[in-house]
Amino acid sequence: MGVLSLVVLASSNLRAQDAAIGNSPLSQAASRAVMNVAASGYVGNAACARCHASIYESYESTAMAHASGPAMDALTPAEFTHKESGVHYRIYSENGRAWLSFERPGDPEVRGRRELLYYIGSGRRGRSYLFETDGFLFESPVNWYTDKQVWDMAPAYQTSREMPLNLPAYASCLHCHVSEMQPPAKGTDDRYPNPPFLHNGVSCERCHGPGAEHVAGGKIVNPEKLSPGRRDEVCMQCHMEGKVAIEQPGRHAYEFRPGGELSDYVRYFVLAGSQTQGLGAVSQVEALAQSQCKKKSGDRMWCATCHDPHFSPAAEDRVAYYRARCLACHGSAFAVKHHPDQPDCVSCHMPASQSSDVAHTEVTDHRILRRPQVEPQLLQDPSQEASLPKLVPFPANGNRESNPRDLALAWESLVESGMSAGESQAQSLLEKASEKSPNDPALLSALGYIEQKHGKAERARSFYQRALAIDPDLVDAASNLAVIEAKSANSRAAVALWQRAFQLAPGRSEIGLDLAREYCLSGKIDEARDVMLRVLEFNPDLGAAKGMLRRLNRASPSCEP
């Protein structure tokens, strides 16, 4: 659910001072070797390698095995200036530690550095990096893009005029690059225990489940021997994005274990009839489901039909390797008659195209088009559609039908992302779902959000209060309720709500700006300044925050944003 702020930000970007984080717990954890710490039955890759040495050695050459690790293990030193923001970035190592420095010439407020703790991404397409600010984990504003061998801004920030230094490292994204993910602190999105994960990369147990019982002589999950649905979900947990993903009450996607049912943790929704909205970096499962190969092969075809999860062919062997996978179904006689001078099936039928959500990156088209030069018409963004699209669960024939709660929250998510035409649909579904689950804080918060957007403050207040009575750590609900209280001249209640929300999410600039403004209007200028300094600790290039701090420091302070 989104935040409805009193202060409108011109952009969602930021800046920072040099933080003394080199000796922080997260920094120390990042410098250690891979941690094969047994937890909940996990034993680590080393235990697997003792009996499966050849498979382990082969797997170590794959991208998944190196999907994350200490930043110093995968650092390409460089420097560049981002034209739109004017910020100069330098990526370098110093005394065995990785650093990102930044400065805008002529602007002393935008100057500092952050220690890069972990890399995220195997490097086949690119890498992002993680750093810490006061115990909260964030993604670097700059990424390494392998295809073009360049450093550039993180996705969606190519044209940003401010430096985005508060991009939270969400568990929902992070868990697909690491193993034995540790849950963030209650009420937070990006404050993790030390260390945030116990194993670098995608470990053996991410696909086979905890191995303690197997090491002791018992069984372990072999995805190939699971039912087709459970088998496919082992891959789907990280290679399916969908239009909306809804986590189940009290559950998180990173808690899924192979052999279990993924829908017990998260349920996916896609737009009916869409051919995927561009080729996203993690849309492979959805794209494959649209292919005629998959439709006609049914459960016989899955990811491992073409991919060996324990092996990656060398670049010079890939054409022959994947051609053999195609011919296993299509037959050599067919292939001889079909473009005998072109042995590379993939380049024609699964061409690499520019990713729709990651700059400088190409992704393979898993739709396996018969005539790739004739592209199916892509469905435009739903927020631009004259009529409402249909949102359907994925997979459509899953073992469990989507319950009313999931569909209602999925529609609310679309509204939050900009599809205002779906507000009535979302409200209707939310009301029906809340009749069956009257004490679900997610539903209550979502209803409050819709009512607040419609200007029905009293109804929204009631929903938010009920949600917060059940879970007082709902940041969005607290912040949105604070807006209602502030507009109702109930400053004390508004401040208390914003204080709690900002404590849990200090990287959320809009919350800090609202809190500082309310302090200022109450005559508490010192408190307002302290909040602005806290905002700038996380977002030092945020123009709205810098401007408010300057106005607060005047002889006659001004409270306007």
Labelled PLM ranges:
Residues 453, 487-488, 521-522, 551-555:
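Register position in tetratricopeptide repeats
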